[in-house]
Structure formats: C-alpha cells, structure tokens
C-alpha cells in the first residue's frame, strides 16, 4: 500500500484537469514526456456539472473541442454543461491521460532546482509545473449582503441551479457578465427581474441569425488569435489587468 506521506517524483505536474490541463496533457503525451495531472474534482468535468441546470456554452461546439478530438454533434450547436463535462471525461479516457482526481493542491514551492507540490498529506516533486487551474472558483459576495433583510433569498451563481430555488416576487441579479445575463434571462420568464452591473456595451446587430453568428464567431476568433495575445501590447495590457 502506498505511503501517502512519501514524496512522489515526476518530470511534469499539471495542476488542473479542465480544458487547459487536459490540452497540456495531450501535448505532453504526444511527445512521450512523463507527467501527472492533479485535479481537485472527484470526476473529470465536475466543474461543469455543478453549474446551473440550463447552462450552455455561448460558443458553437466546433470551437469547443480540444486538440486531437472534435466535439461531437452539430458544429453550429451550443453544448450543454453536461455535454461539455462528458466530452472532457471522454477526452481524458481516449488519450489515456494520467489524471489523479480528488487531489486539491494546497501549496506550490520551489526547493533548489525542483518544485514541490503539496496536497494534504501528498507531496509531489517535479522538474516543471504547469498551473492550469480555472479563475473565479471562489464565490465573491459583496460585504453589504449580510446587512440585507433575512427574508430576502440570496443566491450566488455558484449555488444557483434553477428558478425553483427562488421565492415569489421580484429578482435582482447583481452582475451583468455572461453568468448574470444568462441567469437573468431564465429568471425573467417567471419573475419581475432587474440587473445591476457595469455597462457591457451592445452588439450593433441581431446575433440570433445564422449569418450573424457565422461572422461574429470568426471575428472573436480573429481577435483572440491575432490581436489579444501576449505577443501584442494590447494583449499583454489586458492580461495584466485581468490578473491584477
């Protein structure tokens, strides 16, 4: 039986088993390099499965696939959260990527010319580490939330699943990003709904048509691949702003 306190040595540790971590794993395996992916979830794709019931990707499935394996189904369809989760699980299985689930990394440190990764009683030593963890995993709740009347139901998007969790009456959605807008549209079908957040701008044409989606996706892809990259000053500036 393995000693959980024994230091395990491996060439490369990848922290995070989502899209980024699995993609890195695919490239490492393709080159025959030894590695191990550590993921805090009990099952690959659980970060998606835990989101609200109606969640869909807002990019077509043709752009949701990872290297070496297309996303199944129609290329212009918008996958559900569970379809995305199952795809990631199938991806790891197909390429036999070494993923160790249920391992939450607590600390990453440098000792000499190596890195030490600590996860509870487990310790791993690696020549290099790829940090592929997702941002925004911890809910952020405004400080004034505790001062609101206790009769007001408060839910963070992290805990929201469907409108059945809400009591009758109006709903205020705080935050006008993708999650806030998506939830507000769903809630508004059965409740008076308001949104509070920064001005997000407006696309100057209707995006629900096939032609609009065709050009919009390609425009976003062009900016993502050629403009907003670390090779361009504007990309580096935006990256610094997001990280800080």
Regions found by a protein language model. Give the residues of each.
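Glycine-rich dinucleotide-binding loop and its adjacent helix/turn
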Residues: 74, 80-83, 133-193
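Phosphate-coordination loops involved in phosphoryl transfer and adenosine-cofactor binding
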Residues: 9-11, 102, 168
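Feature captures the FAD/FMN-dependent oxidoreductase FAD-binding
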Residues: 77-137
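Glycine-rich FAD pyrophosphate-binding loop
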Residues: 13-15, 26-53, 190-205
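Dinucleotide-binding/catalytic capping subdomain of oxidoreductase cores
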Residues: 180-244
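Conserved N-terminal/central alpha/beta ligand/cofactor-binding core
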Residues: 62-89, 94, 229-244
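Conserved N-terminal glycine-rich FAD pyrophosphate-binding loop of Rossmann-like flavoproteins
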Residues: 42-70, 204-218
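N-terminal Rossmann-like FAD-binding beta1-loop-alpha1 element of flavoenzymes
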Residues: 5-37, 173, 179-188
């Amino acid at each position: 039986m393995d000693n959980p306190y024994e230091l395990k040595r491996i060439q490369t540790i990848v922290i995070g088993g989502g899209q980024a971590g699995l993609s890195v794993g695919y490239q490492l395996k393709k080159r025959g390099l030894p590695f191990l992916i550590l993921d805090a979830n009990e099952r690959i794709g659980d970060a998606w499965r835990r989101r609200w019931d109606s969640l869909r990707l807002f990019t077509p499935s043709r752009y949701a696939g990872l290297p070496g394996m297309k996303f199944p189904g129609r290329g212009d369809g918008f996958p559900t959260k569970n379809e995305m989760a199952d795809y990631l699980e199938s991806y790891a299985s197909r390429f036999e990527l070494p993923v160790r689930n249920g391992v939450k990394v607590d600390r990453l440190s440098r000792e000499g010319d190596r890195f030490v990764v600590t996860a509870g009683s487990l310790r791993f030593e690696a020549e290099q580490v790829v940090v592929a963890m997702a941002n925004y995993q911890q809910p952020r709740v405004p400080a004034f939330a505790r001062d609101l009347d206790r009769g007001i139901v408060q839910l963070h998007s992290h805990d929201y699943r469907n409108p059945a969790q809400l009591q009758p009456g109006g709903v205020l959605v705080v935050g006008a990003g993708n999650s806030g807008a998506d939830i507000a549209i769903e809630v508004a079908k059965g409740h008076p709904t308001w949104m509070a957040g920064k001005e997000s701008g407006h696309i100057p044409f209707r995006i629900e048509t096939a032609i609009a989606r065709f050009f919009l996706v390609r425009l976003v892809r062009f900016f993502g691949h050629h403009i907003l990259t670390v090779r361009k000053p504007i990309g580096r500036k935006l990256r610094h702003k997001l990280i800080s």
